[in-house]
Amino acid sequence: MNIIKTLPFFILCLLMSPQAYSDNAVQLTEQRQLFQQAKKALQDNQISRYQMLHKQLDGYPLQGYLQYLYLNGRLSQASNASVSEFLKKEDGSFYAERLRMFWLNKLAQQNRWSDYLNFYQPPQSSARQCYYLQALLASGQKQKAFELTPELWLVPHSQEKACDPVFSAWEAAGLLNNDLRYQRMMLALRANQFSMATYLAKSTANPVDNQQLVKQWQAIHNNPISVFNGLAKNSSLSADTALNREMIIHGLQRLARRSPEQAFTSWSNIKTRYNFSQQDTIEARKAIGKWAALNRDKKALRYFGDIPGGEWQVRAALWQKDWK
C-alpha cells in the first residue's frame, strides 16, 4: 500500500529531473564564468570588481579558494579578524590550513607572539612548532615550552633556525643533559648523518670516546668488508656489546647491497663471535636474502635460511619454483 502511495511522487521526480539538471548545469556554467572573472579581477588588482563578483558566487564550491587568494596576496594588510573569520568559515579545507601557515609565518616574523598563540593549531612544520615554543616563552609559559622541547631536539638532522632560541633557553635552564645529547647523536648515526653525529659527539660528556664511535660507525658504513676482514685486530669492535652488534648488523646490511655472497660469508664467520639476538639474525639474513633475490641469485633462499617468511622470500621461491 505504501509503495502504491509513493509511486506518483517518484514518477513526478523522474519527470522533473531532466529540467532540474538542465537548470543546475546552466547555473554551474554561469558560476564558472563568474569565478574566472573574479580571479582575473584579483590578478588585475581590481578589488571593487572582485568583491562584487565574489558576492555573486555564494554556494559555489571554489568561493572560499578565491577569498584565500585575496587574503594570501594581501597578508601585510590583513587583520586578525579577517583571517580568523576566513579560517572559521573554511575550516577543514586545504586552503584554510595553507592560509593559517602563511599567517603564522607572518606573525612570527613580526614577533606577534600573543596572536601567534591564538592562531596556532597543530600539526605544523618544525619551524612553526619552534615559533610556538618561542611564543610560549615570550608569554611566560616556560614550563610548557620546555616540556615540548625534547621532541624537537631529538631528531637526527640539523633543526630549523627557529629552534635555536628555544634550545638556548632550554640549555640555559639546565635541562639539556648528557643523556639527551647522546640520544640525538645515536639518532644521527642511525640515520647516517655523520657530520651531525660528530658535532653532537663533541658536546657529550665523553667527547673523545664518542667521536671514535662515530668514526667506527662511518668506517663500517663506507667499507664494511674492510672492517670485517680486520675485525680480530679491532679491539674496540671485537668486544661483544649491544652497540658493536648493532654496528655489525648495519655493516652487513650495507655489504649485502653490494655483494650478498660476501655478506653471507662475513655473517657466517662473525655470527659465532657475538651473542646476536634472534632479531639480529633475522635482520642480517633478511638483508642478504633480499638483495640476492633482487639480483635473481639462485642462492637467495639459502641466504634467507629459516627466518620468518617475507615478500622477497616468496618472490625468490616463485621464480626458483621452490615453494616447499
PLM regions with names:
Residues 1-8:
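Bacterial N-terminal signal peptides that target proteins for export
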Residues 16-17:
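N-terminal signal peptide c-region/cleavage motif recognized by signal peptidases
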Residues 21-324:
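Alpha-helical solenoid repeat scaffolds
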Residues 9-10, 21:
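Aromatic (phenylalanine/tyrosine) cluster motif
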